[in-house]
Amino acid sequence: ITGDTTGAIIGALKDHLIKTIVGRDVDDFEELIQAVNRCIVKNTSAKAAVDMALYDLYGQLYKLPVYKLFGGSRRKVVTDITISVNDPQVMAEDTRNAVERGYDTIKVKVGMNPDLDLARLTAVRQAAGPERQIRIDANQAWSPKQAVRLLNQMQEKGLGIELVEQPVPAHDFEGLKFVTQRSYVPVLADESVFSPEDAVKIMQ
């Protein structure tokens, strides 16, 4: 997804990122984070490793876990379970098993075959029942117009899709905007966001 390799990550760490932070005061936290982002372009995997290490050090400095540094902590985190792509009846059985294990949110991969996707989602919805959430991940497979058409079909069939993840190619920010403005299904960007700058661009 990122295009990074293990060698490239190690190189970015040794040649740029570690040299940028070694010997500096972790209490100067905001400047450290900015320096990490400025010292080399891209290389988001290596930057993420340093970012996490700096937050951990900052928490140790003030004897606080990182979740308390961020604020808004919670004792329970809701996650989903991905139902592997298979025949609709197999996916329905997998969904029933997931529900029995306590999952309230089901994730389904879509994008390769619209008719089969609808059959799979229908089976998953019937197995999950009306009270549980179903979210889908198209993995950049659709064009903007195709995404709107298919999402509208899903809504018309009463599938109750909670959100769609990355419906269009990662670079197509205008396409994400197009889908967001024309579909009732909320759009989640995934591969489109690899940096704080990407996040700002998405929000704009």
Where are these regions (language model features)?
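Metal- or metallocofactor-binding catalytic centers and their adjacent structured scaffolds
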Residues: I1-L61
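N-terminal small/glycine-rich loop or linker at the start of catalytic domains
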Residues: Q60-D87, Y184
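Beta-strand segments within the central parallel beta-sheet cores of soluble alpha/beta enzyme folds
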Residues: E31-L32, K68-G72, K109
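Catalytic domains of carbohydrate-active enzymes, especially glycoside hydrolases
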Residues: N97-K109
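Catalytic core of soluble alpha/beta enzymes
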Residues: V108-Q204
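Short, charged beta->alpha transition segments
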Residues: Y55, P65-K68, M91-R96
